[in-house]
C-alpha cells in the first residue's frame, strides 16, 4: 500500500468559493448573486452586458472595459451570446457522489480503483461518508443522478469493503452531481477515444482587440493561480488593478488566531458544543469565519442563547444564522442549507423538513 496526502474541503466546494467572494467583498469588490447575463456586445471601447435579476426579473446594463467569461461549464454558451470565436471548447464529464452514514471511524480517505479503472474514494464527512465518483460523458452541463449512477457507486463500494451489510439505496442520505468541463479543440468531433486523458488543466483565451477573456477547464485546486494569470492579462490590457499585492484571502496572522483561542477558552466556548458536532465549536467558528469569529464570541458573551444549536440535528448555532442573514447573501433557504452550510448534504430531506427550529431559522434568514 501507499499513503497519498492532499488538501480537502471540510465543508463543501460552494462554501469554499463563497469564502473567496466574501473576502473579496470585504476588500471593496462588488458581487451579486442570482444575476444572469443575457449577452454582451462591444460599443467603442466598452463591453455592455445586459444582466437580469433572476428573482424580480428586472434588467440592467453593466459597462466594462474588459469582459471575463468565467462561466465554468457555460463558457461556450456565453461566448455564443457575445459572438466570440475560440480555439477551445468544453466537453463534459458527469460525476456524482453519494452521502451515506459513516462507514469507518478512521478519518483517512479510502481510495480504490473502480470497475471502470478510475480512482474511487470514500471521504469522511463527520458522521457521514461521501463515496464516488463516476465519469460519464454527457452532452449538457444540466445533469442529475440516475439509477445507473447509484447502482455503479453502490456496487463498487460493496465489492471493495467488507461491510457488516451491503449498502443499498435506502442508505443514501443525499446526493451530489455536476460536470467537469474538459478542454477540447473547437474543431474536434465528439468522438473522443480516450476520455480519461482529456485535460483537467485550464486554458485562458484572450482577444486583445476586443478585451475579452475566456477561461476553459481548470479545477478549484488551481483557482488562485488562474486568478493571478487573469490579473496579469488584465493589467496588460491597460487596466490598473488597485492593491494588487495585498493578501485578501486565507487565515489572519497567527497572533490573531492566538487571541481568538485565548478568548474562546476564557469563556469556555466548547461547553456549548452540540452532540451532533463533528468538531469543537472553537475550531469550527475560526475555520469558517476567521477574524470575524470575534463578533460571534461577543454575541455569545452578551447572550449565551446565541450559542444554542438552532436547527435540531445540526451543529449550526443561533448567532451563525444571524450572521448568515447579514453577511452571506442568502436569497433562498437552499442557499443556506446547501451552499453556505452542509446541512442538506448530511441530513435527509424529510429530517430537515421536520427539524425543530427550522421555521425559526427561516424567519431569521
PLM features per residue range, with description:
Residues 1-28:
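Rossmann-like flavin
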Residues 3-4, 49-53:
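Short beta-strand segments that buttress and anchor functional surface loops
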Residues 13-19, 23, 80, 85-130, ...:
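C-terminal catalytic lobe of FAD-dependent flavoproteins
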Residues 30-32, 173:
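General small-molecule cofactor/ligand-binding pocket signal
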Residues 33-47:
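A conserved short coil-to-beta-strand element within the FAD-binding core of flavoproteins
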Residues 45-49, 106-108:
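Short, hydrophobic/aromatic-rich segments at coil-to-beta transitions
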Residues 55-66:
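Core beta-strand elements of the Rossmann-like FAD/NAD(P) dinucleotide-binding domain
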Residues 69-84:
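Flavin (primarily FAD) binding-site architecture
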